[in-house]
């Protein structure tokens, strides 16, 4: 039997549609912005708008949200570790090959100063943590520049 007979394709969920694994398992992968947007829309109520802001730069997110007093859900790498090209699998829905970028993590971008961005990060009870701007922007790009914003709808009287 040739070795090609032993190779099997791995299939898995699309992180744009599902959480890959369990949020309670350290070995799980995670999910991407559309999943968080959809979950928030189900629970947040009619007075807020939830927007997938994937593709926006950190500067654009700061201007649109932070400067207006609203935090933004922000994808980067856990503890700003280097991104690592992770495992690949075929998506169950499409058969397309997907490559996970390991060290994926999302947290809440809450502020900035001249040199740093500030995040509320639940990982290991980090609390409010500061990272250098250049590192943050690099890690955000590595995770496909994903973000989710939430704003209160304006009521016209």
Give the location of each predicted region.
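...with weaker cross-activation on analogous glycine-rich loops/strands in unrelated enzymes
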Residues: 54-77, 81
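Short, small-residue-biased leader/transition segments that mark boundaries at the very start
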Residues: 1-7
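Noncatalytic regulatory segments and standalone regulatory/sensor domains
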Residues: 82, 86-101, 110-157
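Structural recognition of the beta-strand scaffold that forms the well-ordered cores
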Residues: 49-51, 71-76, 108, 118-120
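Second-shell loop/turn segments in exported
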Residues: 19-30, 45-53, 62, 95-96, ...
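Extracytoplasmic
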Residues: 69, 102-104
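Extracytoplasmic/secreted envelope proteins and their assembly/folding machinery
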Residues: 33, 37-41, 59, 63, ...
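Loop/turn elements at helix/coil->beta-strand transitions in domains of secreted/extracellular proteins
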Residues: 43-47, 67-73, 113-116
């Amino acid at each position: 039997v040739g070795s090609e007979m032993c190779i099997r394709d791995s299939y898995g969920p699309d992180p744009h549609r599902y959480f890959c694994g369990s949020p309670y398992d350290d070995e799980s992968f995670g999910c991407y912005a559309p999943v968080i947007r959809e979950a928030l829309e189900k629970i947040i109520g009619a007075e807020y708008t939830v927007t997938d802001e994937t593709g926006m730069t950190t500067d654009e997110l700061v201007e649109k949200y932070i400067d207006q007093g609203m935090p933004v859900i922000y994808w980067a790498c856990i503890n700003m570790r280097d991104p690592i090209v992770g495992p690949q699998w075929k998506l169950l829905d499409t058969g397309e090959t997907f490559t996970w970028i390991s060290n994926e993590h999302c947290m809440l971008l809450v502020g900035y100063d001249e040199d740093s961005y500030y995040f509320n990060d639940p990982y290991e009870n980090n609390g409010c943590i500061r990272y250098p701007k250049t590192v943050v922007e690099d890690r955000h790009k590595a995770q496909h520049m994903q973000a989710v914003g939430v704003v209160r709808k304006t009521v016209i009287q």
